[in-house]
Design a protein with these regions (language model features):
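Cytosolic/nucleoplasmic/matrix-facing N-terminal domains/tails
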Residues: 1-76
Length: 76
């Protein structure tokens, strides 16, 4: 099964956007983007922050936020 991190990372790479650019544009720290793309969710203080970052990141990449959050809920 495809994960949220894989979908986001693949889309970012298809758009040829670096982690530094994504971080600068979204104001999400690079380390958090790496955690999300690696499906490492334990470093986040709360699920509210995690879901907020996923939403911002998905919107930035032009993905359907509802589908991405549903995928997150389905796999966690």
């Amino acid at each position: 099964m495809v994960t949220v991190g894989e979908v986001l990372k693949n889309k970012r790479k298809n758009l040829r956007r670096s982690l530094d650019l994504v971080s600068a544009d979204t104001k999400i720290q690079k380390r958090f983007i790496k955690y999300i793309e690696s499906n490492e969710f334990s470093p986040f203080e709360s699920e509210v922050f995690l879901k907020g970052f996923i939403k911002i990141y998905a919107e930035y990449l032009g993905l359907d936020v509802k589908k991405i959050l549903a995928l997150y809920r389905k796999t966690h």
